[in-house]
Amino acid sequence: MTKASVLIATLGGQPQVVTFALDALLAQNEEITAVYVIHLSLDNLRTRQALTRVQQEFAGDQYAGRRCRLRRVPILLAGAPLADIHDEAGAEATGQTMRTLLGDLKRDGERLHLCLSGGRRMMALLALSAAALLCDHQDRIWHLYTPDAVRQQAAGGALMHVAPAAGVQLIQTPIVPWG
């Protein structure tokens, strides 16, 4: 088994992105001890429902019979949850959230898996930028590929887990870290 690590996932309205990615990592014998879900304001009904659905999978800091804690990371602007990334201030707040989270986890010696397939594209772009600065060669950045038929069946968290034969795959995103 590999060194313990954490999963960081961006979240929008599709909660299964988090569990599909985590299931794929566990199937690769990764020991994931925590999942950090980065999200915009819970005033958005889809985001709130998605987070609630993800939280149901982590009752008692357990996931699929393993100890794994879920931590939510809201994006804040001036101390308030950011509703959406519609201007430069929102982009800066999102980037700062990404840099702070990744920096804190790296200072704690964590090995990171980043799944950037959920939520707004800008969240993924800013997380990728932070990863280039703060991650090292032991960290991994992933895109979650979900076949169209599975995506339709799983929409909104209707399916939170699928069999390997369903074709859901993590695709490693090449990045040369500066850190």
Model segments located where?
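Conserved SAM-binding loop
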Residues: 116
